[in-house]
Amino acid sequence: MMTKAFFNKLPFEVFRRYVRTGKSIPQRSPRTRKSLLVGGTIASAVVLYNFNDTFHDSVKHTALTTKRIAVVTQATTRCFYHYKRALNKSYENKKEREVALNKCHKMCALITLHALRSNGGIYIKLGQHIGAMTYLLPKEWTDTMIPLQDHCPESTYEEIDELFKEDLGTSIEDMFLEFNKTPIGVASLAQVHVAKLKNSDGKGSSVAVKCQHPSLKEFIPLDVMLTRTVFELLDVFFPDYPLTWLGDELQSSIYVELNFTKEAENAEKTRHYFSKFKKQTALKIPKVIESHKRILIMEYVGGKRLDDLEYIDSHGISRSEVSSCLSHIFNNMIFTPNVGIHCDPHGGNLAIRSVKPAKDNGYHNFEIVLFDHGLYRYPSTRTRRLYAKFWLSLLFDKDQTKMKKYAKGFANITDEQFPLLAAAITGRSIDAALNYDISTSRTQEEMDVMANGILEGTLLSDLMSILSRIPRVVLLILKTNDLTRHLDECLQNPLGPERTFLIMTQYCAKTVYDEKVERINSEYARWSIKWMWENLTNWIVYERRINQLYFYDFVLWWKKFIPKTWLSS
């Protein structure tokens, strides 16, 4: 209980008493004045923190900002230290160096994982991409990042409710008949809840409600700045490994992904386009019901992860058929003019569900569900055509001179950088890529050579130099290729990668054929002798390629499914 003596000693009581009596206020010693100043400041801060919302929010923001900066700084410093130590140390033999580097990879990957999880948001997205780069990064890094695909930090129900009140002016309870407080999926930028909308019939329809993490609004500018700073520091300490381009790409794409109205537009456009290709793709894109900048309401479509082999096998779904549909989906996006490319097809953004074969699913017994349409890119027609010609030169013509010519055209590289780019595009070793030996599955030995060899000599610095030169839209095409290649490997397709390469070659051949038709129509009068001859020649070349591909596909199927005893006899 506060006593009268206590109140009489408060500064304002002392001042009031001396004014009333006319006596002068005695001078305090410097030490006493300093104590009073510090105490007064602390007391004022406590009062403001508890009773002034603006001051409270400022202090809280400063504390959280300091924490995020500290997490990034500490993780970066520790990784720098461990790698500097491991790379500069002398080893008795190559095996000892390899073991030491593997330990360093694992240690730094765990440090990074902890930092990414601690800060969440765009850091999770960085970790997801690291986890998908199996063709490039050591196994210790990619395996460590796998949990980030669908085990991300979630926002509380109270935070989501505040988001609805702030953005829509209504609470969750007022808008929905039912709302599951536990999200069915949590990603780096948002989480999804199952709910039932209030309908006029009083029953309610099941929907998926995608809610952006509220904290992103406050910290995205800071996080973008921090990641750019980290990459710039890497550039200072490791000038041979330029990574500032990654920070630039993150800054240019993250704000697009955070606008859910743009995602709704991409989803509806893609859903409408692929409705014509159900037989080839079995693709299902949830219909958008309502969209806002930070809230997206869609039809609810359930499913399992695409790499859930137990679910696939138990429902009688063909792995090779799923792999083929995946290949059709993303090659259609990459090679068809004016069609957007989904640039984030990692395991958490794809699902598979068992259905009854019908016309609206292409008579498949499954559907591939594609989520998260926030980031799409539209490469120029020239880029798509050069990219198609590169693959035809590799897979069909087996002509390294042509490969180099087209790679320089779409990737802005030098002759010396071509071998490494070929390996990066194909996800194979340099020898395999340049010897046209990429249609067979990667062996464990090849993957080990690629992962461990990346730190030998100047290979890693050369690769980073290439990535810093490549146009951003081409980088996103390569990223999409990386992620779909990783998914295909997870499916353990019994037909191997040969089938997916055959499908891609069909799209490449059609792209080149369409380009020649366009050129012929612009150069010659329609129905002239020359026009008809050029079109006939172009059609014959195209049909010959397609028929060869069909024959290879048949042979592949025959070798896989016809009993070996028949083949031997």
From Swiss-Prot:
Q: What is the protein name stated in its UniProt record?
A: ABC1 family protein MCP2
Any one Pfam family here would be: ABC1
Q: What does the record list as GO biological process?
A: lipid homeostasis; mitochondrion organization
* Gene Ontology CC terms: mitochondrial inner membrane; mitochondrial membrane; mitochondrion
Annotated compartments: Mitochondrion; Mitochondrion inner membrane
Q: Which residues form the signal peptide?
A: none
- Transit peptide location: 1-18
Residue intervals annotated with topology Mitochondrial matrix: 19-34
